[in-house]
């Protein structure tokens, strides 16, 4: 996932983390301590804390199905793939198959192992990838909200009260954008 990824690509990435690794845990460094985190828990807490929902209805449906089963099964328990592969919506089935099989073509070469070249483990990849994907997604949502509000400022029929409200919200969103930008810098470095 790159900083220039679209919000839809980031939604897909977050769904991939849920479907493939939602039951897995990783350690995230906070200050000097390592904090154990569950992939699904981190994604749901981050989305819920800001009241975010996926804009792509297909990914939102997969997210809702996963969340429903996750609540029943509990944290750390793998949500069986059949909930997605046998979903009543054929588009959810197709997208799930595509996501679940997308990375299966990549296997570390035996040459790498013989030469002692470090191959990143799933846990190492999750510790960076999950927080980064969630943060980048939040950034894209904030950018879209700012753009929408800036469009409203250009409206000639906007009242003074609405104008003050829009400017106030723009200021708040820009502060969040700066916070996210700082966080992304830390995640990438």
What are the residue ranges of the model-derived segments?
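Non-catalytic protein-protein interaction segments used by genome-maintenance enzymes to assemble
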Residues: 1-82, 94-98, 102-110, 142-146
């Amino acid at each position: 996932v790159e900083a220039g990824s679209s919000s839809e690509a980031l939604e897909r990435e977050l769904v991939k983390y849920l479907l493939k690794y939602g039951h897995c845990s990783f350690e995230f460094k906070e200050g000097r301590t390592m904090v154990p985190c569950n992939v699904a828990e981190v994604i749901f807490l981050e989305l819920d804390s800001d009241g975010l929902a996926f804009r792509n209805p297909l990914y939102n449906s997969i997210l809702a199905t996963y969340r429903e089963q996750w609540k029943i099964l509990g944290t750390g328990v793998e949500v069986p793939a059949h909930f997605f592969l046998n979903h009543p919506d054929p588009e959810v089935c197709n997208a799930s198959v595509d996501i679940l099989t997308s990375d299966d073509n990549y296997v570390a070469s035996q040459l790498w192992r013989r030469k002692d070249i470090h191959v990143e483990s799933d846990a190492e990849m999750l510790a960076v990838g999950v927080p980064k994907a969630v943060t980048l997604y939040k950034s894209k949502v904030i950018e879209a909200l700012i753009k929408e509000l800036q469009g409203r400022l250009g409206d000639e029929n906007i009242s003074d009260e609405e104008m003050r409200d829009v400017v106030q919200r723009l200021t708040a969103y820009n502060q969040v954008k700066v916070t996210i930008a700082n966080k992304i810098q830390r995640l990438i470095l």
